[in-house]
């Protein structure tokens, strides 16, 4: 395992927070800690960042998904020990993820992710209340690494995504901040091991391990584990600097994606109107929408559908294309009067000379 200078790793996390204006000394931060090596390192690093004035009040959240029996209970005990060691308040909860997935018919991993972030937002609200800080100023810190980002890049390459999807992970997404996105998993494990060698306080489980291992992460029938253990190692054989190279590539994509998203903000402000106060009721695309550049129109439609379907929904390419087809490119982008289509989410797309409406089919009828 490669050695790493503690200060170097903490310096890099501090630089991410500062350069990207993600947090400061007044920022309450909820740390999502599973007990694995990445999130355990995040807990130690966040405490050092707090001491430097790069973060404000801290708290931890641990969610027991009740999927791994006694192993999950041992994870919870380890995180409780870690929180006590660092003198950081701990929020913990148990959620029957398997039962919820069976009830809703959703994928277990998708349900786990959704419930985890719901719990994180609730815990952050409590932390901000205690810190007398507006909720909008609070942050949820996750331990996603350069490895996670590269894995997401390959996963999206396999299943398909829009250009913006190849940025893989953002340093910030709403209240969620990822300060370790430039660090590798190997570096974080070396950091913890070095902490122990230096005599700094560290948590250990009953077997003397410095972090918890989730055995299911090795099960290659799971998509991310397959990419992690089968694809990324082969790619590293070709290029040992894969994490750094793809990291730079994804940052370039992210810069251009941010610029395009800013342009879409302007397009939507001028040519897209929500029906009512929320997009739940639908929206209208003005006639002039069809004359805008296709890449911007496509992104705007994608965003409008995401707002209507919910953040966890996967917007289908066919749905986006069905909305775009309501405008006649050969006629300068004018709406095709009489055009009607039914797309995912039982949404109706209809066009007339006043524009293109996207609304629930029940409202259209």
Cite the ranges covered by each PLM segment.
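Residue-level marker of positions within ordered structural domains that often coincide
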Residues: 43, 117, 197, 236, ...
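Non-catalytic, surface-exposed connector residues within folded enzymatic/regulatory domains
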Residues: 73, 102, 225, 240-243, ...
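Mid-to-C-terminal catalytic subdomains of enzymes
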Residues: 196-251, 255-258, 272, 335, ...
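Core alpha/beta nucleotide-donor-binding catalytic domains of modification enzymes
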Residues: 2-229
């Amino acid at each position: 395992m490669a050695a790493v200078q503690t200060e170097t790793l903490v310096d890099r996390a501090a630089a991410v927070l500062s350069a990207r204006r993600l947090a400061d000394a007044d920022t309450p931060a909820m740390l999502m800690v599973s007990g694995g090596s990445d999130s355990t390192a995040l807990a130690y690093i966040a405490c050092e960042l707090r001491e430097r004035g790069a973060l404000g009040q801290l708290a931890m959240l641990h969610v027991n998904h009740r999927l791994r029996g006694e192993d999950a209970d041992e994870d919870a005990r380890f995180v409780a020990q870690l929180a006590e060691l660092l003198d950081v308040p701990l929020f913990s909860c148990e959620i029957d993820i398997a039962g919820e997935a069976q009830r809703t018919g959703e994928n277990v991993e998708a349900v786990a992710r959704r419930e985890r972030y719901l719990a994180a937002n609730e815990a952050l609200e409590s932390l901000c209340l205690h810190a007398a800080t507006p909720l909008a100023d609070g942050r949820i810190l996750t331990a996603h690494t350069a490895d996670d980002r590269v894995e997401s890049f390959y996963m999206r390459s396999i299943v398909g995504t829009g250009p913006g999807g190849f940025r893989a992970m953002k340093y910030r997404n709403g209240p969620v901040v990822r300060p370790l996105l430039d660090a590798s998993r190997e570096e974080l494990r070396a950091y913890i091991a070095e902490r122990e060698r230096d005599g700094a306080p560290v948590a250990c489980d009953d077997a003397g391990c410095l972090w918890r291992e989730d055995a299911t992460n090795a099960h290659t029938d799971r998509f991310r584990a397959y990419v992690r253990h089968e694809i990324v190692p082969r790619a590293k054989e070709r290029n040992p600097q894969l994490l750094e190279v793809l990291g730079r590539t994804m940052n370039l994509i992210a810069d251009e994606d941010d610029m395009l998203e800013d342009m879409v903000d302007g397009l939507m402000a001028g040519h897209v109107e929500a029906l009512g106060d929320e997009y739940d009721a639908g929206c209208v695309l003005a006639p002039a929408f069809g004359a805008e550049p296709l890449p911007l129109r496509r992104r705007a439609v994608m965003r409008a559908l995401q707002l209507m379907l919910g953040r966890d929904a996967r917007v289908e390419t066919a749905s986006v294309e069905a909305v775009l087809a309501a405008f006649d490119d050969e006629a300068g982008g004018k709406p095709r009067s009489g055009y009607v289509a039914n797309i995912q989410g039982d949404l109706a797309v209809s066009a007339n000379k006043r524009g293109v409406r996207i609304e629930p089919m029940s409202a259209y009828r």
